[in-house]
């Protein structure tokens, strides 16, 4: 028996990052997936997409006037918190009223999206993504701090280095590789490199096997952005039992549940990271990762039934829907 076809509409950069592939794997159990890679200012292939009864939008979604043409479809959207930028609370409210009017169903990978939607009548599914744990990290068997920092141009070494006592650090593995379109500030302080034993990775691209090899040698992961839609590198680090240091915003402050798992900071943080929290709680982090992964395995089963439900169209006063 052949599978139903599903239009999977994704942001074009994810062709390379493959950040939406974990959802493709889930959806492919039920559907034959046809990818549409959307890029801003390029023509939307309306006629092709309109042939599908089921549509899944990851990260991106088309403007309201376009989405209105798909009202009789079964649509599920997984927005990313770090990509939702509203001019003010008024436009935020109007946006979610439009999503509600279209009956689009929403997966929420962040509590911040729940707060953004507020009380709008939108059918949602709250999920926390975790991957299968793999506890082989050699560094976690040692009584020293080995730090990995992938500098993506969003956070600098100076933003978090003061959180550590210098005597506790064995080495810092530093990979300067910015996000597309982001200009990095050079970190070329020779004395700092010597004092903190900073080891540079001078590559433009790090294959996944090399990336995971570094994880094996480090027990602390510095979250590279101030906010995330999901934070796939964070999820990978959690699966290795690493101690996560993250800025106080989504999704870091959701994944870091207590000080045995990681450390949350902002510009006003003066507290230092406790050496014993890193070294003595590896077993706790392992159990925490296993527990949360098992929850994910159960919860992800709700995705396909939600997608297959017919969109619930809600009539709204027309003046609310004239924006965008």
Predicted feature descriptions by range:
Residues 1-61, 249, 264:
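N-terminal pre-catalytic "stem/leader" segment of glycosyltransferase-like enzymes
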Residues 54-56, 69-86, 107:
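Active-site proximal beta-strand in glycosyltransferases
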Residues 82-83, 88-106:
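Membrane-proximal helix-turn-helix segments that form the acceptor-binding/catalytic region
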Residues 133-134, 141-194, 198:
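Conserved catalytic-core segment of nucleotide-activated headgroup transferases in glycan assembly
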Residues 212, 235-239, 253-254:
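Short alpha-helical segment that forms part of, or immediately flanks, the ligand-binding pocket
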Residues 226:
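Aromatic "clamp/platform" in nucleotide-sugar-dependent glycosyltransferases that forms part
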Residues 243-246:
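Short hydrophobic beta-strand element within catalytic cores of glycosyltransferases
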Residues 267-319:
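A charged, aromatic-enriched C-terminal amphipathic alpha-helix characteristic of glycosyltransferases
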């Amino acid at each position: 028996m052949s599978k139903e076809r599903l239009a999977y509409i994704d942001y074009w950069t994810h062709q390379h990052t493959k950040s939406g592939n974990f959802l493709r794997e889930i959806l492919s159990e039920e559907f034959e997936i046809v990818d549409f890679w959307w890029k801003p200012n390029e023509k939307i292939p309306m006629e092709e997409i309109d042939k599908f009864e089921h549509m899944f939008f990851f990260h991106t979604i088309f403007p309201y006037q376009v989405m209105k043409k798909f009202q009789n479809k079964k649509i599920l959207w997984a927005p990313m918190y770090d990509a939702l930028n509203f001019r003010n609370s008024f436009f935020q409210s109007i946006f979610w009223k439009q999503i509600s009017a279209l009956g689009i169903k929403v997966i929420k990978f962040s509590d911040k999206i729940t707060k953004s939607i507020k009380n709008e009548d939108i059918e949602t599914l709250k999920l926390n993504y975790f991957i299968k744990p793999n506890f082989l990290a050699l560094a976690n068997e040692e009584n020293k701090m080995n730090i990995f920092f992938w500098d993506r141009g969003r956070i600098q070494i100076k933003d978090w280095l003061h959180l550590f006592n210098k005597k506790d650090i064995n080495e810092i593995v530093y990979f300067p590789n910015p996000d597309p379109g982001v200009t990095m500030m050079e970190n070329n302080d020779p004395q700092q490199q010597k004092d903190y034993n900073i080891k540079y990775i001078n590559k433009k691209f790090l294959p996944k096997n090399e990336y995971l090899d570094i994880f094996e040698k480090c027990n602390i992961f510095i979250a590279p952005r101030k906010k995330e839609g999901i934070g796939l590198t964070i999820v990978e680090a959690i699966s290795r039992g690493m101690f996560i240091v993250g800025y106080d915003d989504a999704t870091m402050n959701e994944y870091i549940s207590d000080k045995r798992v990681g450390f949350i900071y902002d510009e006003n943080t003066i507290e230092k990271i406790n050496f014993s929290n890193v070294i003595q709680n590896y077993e706790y982090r392992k159990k925490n990762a296993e527990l949360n992964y098992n929850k994910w395995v159960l919860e992800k089963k709700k995705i396909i039934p939600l997608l297959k439900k017919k969109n619930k169209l809600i009539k709204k006063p027309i003046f609310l829907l004239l924006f965008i």
